[in-house]
């Protein structure tokens, strides 16, 4: 008999990390300004979210958390706050077009990284390579077929 095909996952989370160069840390106000200029809104769970509507209304497409546990941001502390990095995450299945949401999250992570002088890393905190991006795209496609 033929082996049973692997069941497709019911859910997944695509993670892209943005980390400071070496031991550099991202400072609060500079980080928060970059996230906000790139369409993210501070909200639920004290983290940033990209909504379907740029005004901050509508469904959440993806979110950004502090890389350091417990993951939230201390926005009121502004300049006193710093972190070695941030984590962008796209839960699957998601609202809307998963491929579009992934592309938007990747572009946003690259923009924030460029503005802050950081590195874009994968979920294991290794450099994000074109092969890894392709792997992420394949994982996203599984949910586009459902």
Annotate each language-model stretch with its function.
Residues 42-78:
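Positively charged, polar, low-complexity stretches
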Residues 87-146:
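Well-ordered alpha/beta subsegment
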Residues 1-10:
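Extended, low-complexity intrinsically disordered regions enriched in serine/proline/glycine/threonine
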């Amino acid at each position: 008999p033929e082996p049973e095909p692997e069941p497709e996952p019911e859910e997944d989370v695509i993670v892209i990390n943005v980390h400071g160069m070496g031991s550099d840390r991202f400072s609060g106000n500079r980080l928060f300004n970059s996230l906000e200029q790139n369409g993210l809104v501070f909200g639920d769970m004290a983290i940033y979210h990209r909504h379907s509507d740029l005004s901050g209304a509508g469904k959440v497409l993806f979110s950004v958390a502090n890389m350091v546990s417990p993951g939230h941001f201390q926005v009121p502390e502004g300049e006193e706050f710093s972190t070695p990095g941030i984590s962008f995450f796209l839960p699957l299945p998601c609202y809307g077009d998963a491929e579009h949401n992934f592309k938007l999250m990747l572009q946003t992570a690259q923009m924030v990284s460029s503005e802050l002088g950081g590195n874009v890393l994968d979920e294991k905190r290794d450099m994000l390579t074109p092969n890894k991006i392709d792997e992420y795209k394949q994982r996203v496609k599984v949910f586009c077929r459902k």
